[in-house]
A protein has these predicted regions:
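Glycine-rich portal/gate segments that line the openings of hydrophobic small-molecule binding cavities
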Residues: 32, 41-91, 101-104, 135, ...
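Beta-strand/loop substructures that line and gate deep hydrophobic ligand-binding cavities in soluble
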Residues: 83-135
Length: 153
C-alpha cells in the first residue's frame, strides 16, 4: 500500500543485553534517553504482555505523532514486540543479541501512516519521511548506550 513504511535498523550497543532490554521494554524511559524524539509517554505500570502505553513523539520535520502501543511479546532479554495504532498503525519488534562487546540491536518497524496529513503527503514526501525516521533512529543510537550503561551499574 502507498502509505506503508517498512524499516529495519541495526546497530551495536556497548552495554549489557539485560540493561538494553530493560530500556527498550519500558517505554516510560524513552523521554529520558531518546531525546528530543520522545516528548511524553504514559504507561500502565511495569512492562508486560498486554500492557499499553501512549506516546507523543516527533522527528526533525515539523509534525508530531501520537500513538498507543500494546506489548504483544516480551522475552527477556531478547525480544520486545508491540502493536501500535493512532497516527501510525502497525507493529514494531526489538530483537537483541549478545555480542562480545555488548548487545546487537535490531528494530523492525512496519507501519501505515494513518495521520491524515502524512497519508496525503506520502506519495510526494516519502523520501523525506524516511529521512525523518533515520534521524529519529540516530537519536536512539546516541541515547540508548549511555542510558543502558547507567542501568547496568
Amino acid at each position: 500500500m502507498a502509505d506503508e513504511y517498512v524499516f529495519i535498523d541495526e546497530w551495536d550497543v556497548d552495554a549489557p543485553q539485560e540493561a538494553v532490554f530493560d530500556a527498550l521494554a519500558d517505554a516510560r524511559t524513552y523521554p529520558e534517553w531518546w531525546r528530543p524524539v520522545y516528548i511524553d509517554v504514559e504507561a500502565e505500570g511495569e512492562p508486560d504482555v498486554g500492557k499499553e502505553s501512549r506516546q507523543h513523539f516527533k522527528g526533525r520535520l515539523p509534525y508530531h505523532l501520537h500513538t498507543r502501543s500494546r506489548i504483544t511479546t516480551l522475552e527477556p532479554p531478547h525480544i520486545v514486540e508491540a502493536d501500535v495504532d493512532g497516527d501510525l498503525r502497525g507493529h514494531g519488534k526489538w530483537t537483541l543479541t549478545e555480542t562480545p562487546g555488548g548487545t546487537h540491536v535490531r528494530f523492525d518497524w512496519q507501519v501505515f501512516a494513518d495521520k491524515p496529513l502524512l497519508r496525503l503527503l506520502t506519495p510526494i514526501l516519502r523520501p523525506a519521511f524516511r529521512w525523518n525516521h533515520a534521524w529519529a533512529i540516530a537519536r536512539a543510537r546516541e541515547g540508548l548506550e549511555p542510558y543502558a550503561r547507567r542501568l547496568a551499574v
